[in-house]
């Protein structure tokens, strides 16, 4: 049966990519993304001059969440490999030169398309242009992904905390949709802190997509907990994540014990201040920062802030 095939396939690392891709092709539902069903529908002309050694990919779908946030999906180059949680340098031709910025890949490694979640900066060198993209437009991407928010950079544990603010949720959007995350951890907690309630919607959309996915929904089950908080509006869960960690409210709300380096692992992505403060709290709890070449109890992405 297809379910048996899937369960069997992802035992081997390459196998479940194939099974998930096949399922993704069959089950992909684009109704909420206002996008066409096929990549082939676009025969967009490539820009006249594309820099050497970069990919030129076609935008497939764009969804604007607020006046500050949007997500988009684009074609994935044949042969482009990455680990869930990594980032890529993406860009646009502005005038006659390319402008690039680091963006976490929000889609999981098995997805046949690439997804990104972006802030809109009115005078940003790249985002002032990127926020105007439409299906059929061309986005550039450098060929080598990288990043520290990968499962390989953590030592084995029981529970994985993903601490995010703003667009810092993007690498975790990739990881919470990757079966390997649930092979390695019994529990996964995604915290997402924003200023306003409307900015949390991407996280809620991700939860719904996982629940509705034929295979991921069954595999994830109740292993994944979502903890959204806001700092500027009334909401059931309010406050900076570091304040909620320090007071213990985070753990009380989740029904979990405080951080324990024997079982808990962490990943952090967000604003500069949030990275610094969350790192300090994890270290105070006895967790040690790791890296790709030296796995430990938690990792931080410092390549950009969101």
Each language-model region and where it sits:
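Short hydrophobic alpha-helical segments enriched in small aliphatic residues
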Residues: 5-9
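Reductase modules of NAD(P)H-dependent flavoproteins
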Residues: 35-44, 49-55, 191, 196-306
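Ferredoxin-reductase
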Residues: 36-137
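Short, Lys/Arg- and Gly-enriched loop/turn segments at beta-strand edges
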Residues: 96-103, 146-154
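Helix-loop module immediately N-terminal to the HCX5R catalytic loop
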Residues: 139-147, 244-248
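Ser/Thr-glycine-rich phosphate-binding loops at phosphate-binding pockets of nucleotides
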Residues: 165-171
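Histidine-anchored nucleotide/phosphate-binding helix
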Residues: 171-180
